[in-house]
Amino acid sequence: MADPSTLTHPDPEGGVRMMDASQKSDSARTAVAAGRVHLGEEAFRRVREHDIEKGDVLTTAQIAGIMGAKQTDKLIPLCHDATINGVEVDFTFNEDEQAIDVRAFTKSFGVTGVEMEALTAVSVASLTIYDMCKSVTKDIRIGDVHLRAKTGGQSGNWKSKSEDTSPAES
């Protein structure tokens, strides 16, 4: 277990608090997150062919992902309200898996990182794909939501060992 004196969120009595970021310097920050929505054969085909009753699945999911990133501090306890300067959400059809790969890129100039915003964008976009396709099948799996890379801040740049793409290249 971590030494309680080194943790940033517990208060002296062991309760929780939001970390004070007021002494940190503004810096450029980016984050890339990814995930996958396994749809199965019919739903995958119908999304590709724009044949879902609710409408354009990927455009709706893209908007939802961007909206999710902007609401992260309202959804995640103790998450700072980051100044988001840009959010991109995009999709790739994964034929082998009959899945849609979801990627989000977030950008900010501020005192806190935007990793949680990128992860939230992927999660909300994925949930939206589920919602729009559930009339075709309920056997939809959302998975592998993870941070691929981040830049900036006190901890510097980081890239997942399982990824070969940096935020600038994503």
Swiss-Prot record:
Pfam families this protein is in? MoaC
Q: Domain of life, per the record?
A: Bacteria
Pathway(s) per entry: Cofactor biosynthesis; molybdopterin biosynthesis
Ranges for the region named Disordered are 1-25
User: Which enzyme type, at the first EC level?
Assistant: lyase
Query: Which catalysed reactions does the entry list for this protein?
Result: (8S)-3',8-cyclo-7,8-dihydroguanosine 5'-triphosphate = cyclic pyranopterin phosphate + diphosphate
Quote the EC number.
4.6.1.17
The UniProt annotation places substrate binding at 78-80, 116-117
Could you state one GO biological process linked to this protein? Mo-molybdopterin cofactor biosynthetic process
Active-site residues, as the UniProt record annotates them: 131
State the Gene3D superfamilies in the record.
Molybdopterin cofactor biosynthesis C (MoaC) domain (3.30.70.640)
**Which keywords has UniProt assigned to this entry?**
Lyase, Molybdenum cofactor biosynthesis
Q: Which GO terms describe its molecular function?
A: cyclic pyranopterin monophosphate synthase activity
**Per the record's keyword annotation, is Magnesium included, yes or no?**
no
Which NCBIfam families does the entry mention? moaC (TIGR00581), PRK09364.1 (NF006870)
Q: Which family is it part of?
A: Belongs to the MoaC family.
Q: How does it assemble?
A: Homohexamer; trimer of dimers.
Q: What does this protein do?
A: Catalyzes the conversion of (8S)-3',8-cyclo-7,8-dihydroguanosine 5'-triphosphate to cyclic pyranopterin monophosphate (cPMP).
Protein name, UniProt field: Cyclic pyranopterin monophosphate synthase
Instruction: Report the gene name.
Output: moaC
